[in-house]
Regions:
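Short, Lys/Arg-rich flexible segments
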Residues: 1-73, 77-80, 85-125
């Protein structure tokens, strides 16, 4: 076996190891993110309007070639922006109040970004 083939073999093996590491980290962190979102999401309103919101967080894994695309979403997607950022309460076209923001996505998003990077760095050492 010549030097070029040996180097290519070593690089291929390394690349496959990195790909597996990244996929494993993405899967583990996304599962933990779902747990955190379910724990920190608003549970119910006074009128029971979104009582299942906290339980509706899901992970979709969509592989694209060797890279995974992890999507974390809520089935009640219409509520995510309203709950995260707050919104006006309108009755019959008149603003009657304001619902305060309940930030629960942004803290988990920040954690996911730092945790993925940290775990990949640790795995490569």
């Amino acid at each position: 076996m010549d030097l070029t083939a040996q180097v290519n073999s070593i690089l291929q093996e390394y690349a496959e190891g990195v790909d597996k590491l990244v996929l494993d980290v993405e899967e583990d962190v996304s599962k933990e993110a779902i747990k955190r979102l379910k724990k920190t999401s608003p549970k119910a309103s006074r009128n029971g309007g979104h009582k299942h919101y906290a339980d509706d967080w899901k992970v979709d894994n969509r592989s694209k070639k060797q890279y995974a695309k992890i999507i974390i979403h809520n089935k009640q997607y219409q509520l995510t922006h309203l709950l995260e950022n707050g919104h006006d309460i309108v009755r019959e076209g008149v603003v009657v109040g304001h619902a305060a923001a309940q930030p629960h996505i942004k803290p988990v998003e920040s954690w996911v970004k730092s945790e993925v990077e940290k775990r990949i760095r640790e795995g490569l050492e």
